[in-house]
Amino acid sequence: MNLEEIQDPSFLKNYSNKQLEELAADIRRFLIEKLSATGGHIGPNLGVVELTLALHQLFDSPKDKLLWDVGHQAYVHKILTGRAPQFDTLRQYKGLCGFPKRTESEHDVWETGHSSTSLSGAMGMATARDLKGTNENIVAIIGDGALTGGMALEALNHIGHEQKHLIVVLNDNEMSIAPNVGALHSILGRLRTAGKYQKAKEDLETIIRKIPAFGGKLADTAERLKDSLKYLMVSGMFFEEMGFTYLGPVDGHDLDDLKHQLSYAKKTSGPVLVHVLTKKGKGYKPAEEDATGAWHGTGPYKMESGEMVKKPGPPSYPSVFANTLKRIAREDERVVAITPAMPGGSKLDLFAEEFPDRMFDVGIAEQHAATMSAGLATQGMKPVYAVYSTFLQRGYDQVVHDICRQNLNVLIAIDRAGLVGADGETHQGVFDIAFLRSLPNITILNPKDENEFQHMLYTGICYDDGPIAIRYPRGNGTGVKMDASLSRLPIGKWNVLQEGTDAAILTFGTMIPVAEKALAQLKQAGYNIRLINANSVKPLDEKLLEALAEEELPLLTIEESVLQGGFGSAVLEFYNEKGMHVELKRMGIPDYFVEHGSVSELYQEVGLTPERIADTLISMLPQKRKRA
């Protein structure tokens, strides 16, 4: 079938299972080919092809609401809702979003990117449906990894209590990004072997209803019998105790079984959970054999061999992080690492190879990870909480209440700080400076290169005056020479990278090389600009700021973070409190959510380019010269 001719899923209504199986094969071939060029979340999508086909055949989207938790498994849904022609632009600038997007299609009723939100969203939609008196089905599709998130468990508890009719499809592939951890994962493991329970329960009801005269009445009061059967055959039916009707486990690649159970779920009153077992990466051998999560999401790859297409370059910041942490941990047994389900992305899997008892993957539990780090710190340990900037948002109260308020020595290693590119607006790491710098006791640092980064990590672990956050980007380092030994850096003291007398740039991190290119252009035009590495975002270098004000230099702050409440705002606040008058402009991320694209394209969009920096400075300098 030509998938690019699909307009909407209505054509599936009359498809036989044989036709659906042929379509599933076409979809898998399409995804493997297209994603080899663009990259993307191939593993999750290959695993849900039959499930997505069954859902769209049995339900009437967009009247019936399909909510895809996290959303990285929604590519098949996008194909069936008319977006196959756009797959050449997947995750590219102004192209097809890698997650559900309400402005992209009426079939995308719930936007995602972070995990564990679909059940709460579904509960809200089901409540609105009942208040309005309509009858649409609400279906949330959530993975076994996302189900371990605290918000999902909160929603399960409320849904079970309210007994709203909605369907939860648990897509259980035994992996999220990395292999799942925790007690709930163990419960699901037991349920995977409990198919006999569902069959026995259905058979029991059928037998009871066949009893002359009394059968119907007995069937209506058979819950205690079924409960006894449940405890006889399955150790702890977690979901039924939460108030759900549990159906499964179902083979997620068996269309007959899938359609039977989903049809039963539609007819069942109250909340229903359909437990579907899928194979992540199904149909593509390299992805099927992945045991570490490497094929969860990828860049481009060679379709025939599965070999990843990698550009040579310096080590990545996460690799420098893990290797430096190992060096320090060899000398200090108090150093421990905590990650919320991102051991591979953060490279803490490298740390765990050497120190398996000192690395803790707590699952999708950013709040717990933050407070566990605080608890470790109270006992004299040196916890390093490694978390993506975008996911640190999910544990903000714990950073405030448990870490900063108690002034505990926790190092928060903020990975993916700044614009991350293809994952788009749900993953851009541009808010952490704004939401952290208002907190008492915290120190915020940001290195300009990988060499400064290793010294900064050492400084952070040695620091014993409270919490310290170190921000660093996703990509490769700059290729600078790495010092052999580690040393402590002064906190709250900036350094001048380039002297100048016409104006000064205050910036840090990834914006240093961008500013250097701007200064090269300005130098050719006859301007002499000072460049300052403001690597201590909090505290500021107050002595240097006072000296700059006394020189009456025009100042330009540049940051790869939001302007509102950011570094530039901190500099303005300082001068306001001191009553000092300076000519200052700020450059950074404007007040909107930045969508997907390459980082260089996004720099162009938000104005963080050498040309825009040079133009901004030139617009300031004539005013300065005129006053002189």
UniProtKB/Swiss-Prot annotation:
UniProt xrefs under Pfam families: DXP_synthase_N (PF13292), Transket_pyr (PF02779), Transketolase_C (PF02780)
Cofactor: Mg(2+); thiamine diphosphate
InterPro entries, sorted: Dxylulose-5-P_synthase (IPR005477), THDP-binding (IPR029061), Transketo_C/PFOR_II (IPR009014), Transketolase-like_Pyr-bd (IPR005475), Transketolase_BS (IPR020826), Transketolase_C (IPR033248), Transketolase_CS (IPR049557)
GO molecular function terms listed in the Swiss-Prot or TrEMBL record: 1-deoxy-D-xylulose-5-phosphate synthase activity; magnesium ion binding; thiamine pyrophosphate binding
Details of cofactor binding: Binds 1 Mg(2+) ion per subunit. Binds 1 thiamine pyrophosphate per subunit.
UniProt: thiamine diphosphate binding residues: H72, G113, H114, S115, G145, A146, N173, Y284, E366
GO BP: 1-deoxy-D-xylulose 5-phosphate biosynthetic process; isopentenyl diphosphate biosynthetic process, methylerythritol 4-phosphate pathway; terpenoid biosynthetic process; thiamine biosynthetic process
Catalytic activity: D-glyceraldehyde 3-phosphate + pyruvate + H(+) = 1-deoxy-D-xylulose 5-phosphate + CO2
Pathway: Metabolic intermediate biosynthesis; 1-deoxy-D-xylulose 5-phosphate biosynthesis; 1-deoxy-D-xylulose 5-phosphate from D-glyceraldehyde 3-phosphate and pyruvate: step 1/1
UniProtKB keywords: Isoprene biosynthesis, Magnesium, Metal-binding, Thiamine biosynthesis, Thiamine pyrophosphate, Transferase
Cellular component terms per the entry's GO annotation: cytosol
Cited PROSITE patterns: TRANSKETOLASE_1, TRANSKETOLASE_2
NCBIfam families reported for this sequence: dxs, PRK05444.2-2
Family: Belongs to the transketolase family. DXPS subfamily.
Record's function text: Catalyzes the acyloin condensation reaction between C atoms 2 and 3 of pyruvate and glyceraldehyde 3-phosphate to yield 1-deoxy-D-xylulose-5-phosphate (DXP).
Quaternary context: Homodimer.
Protein name: 1-deoxy-D-xylulose-5-phosphate synthase
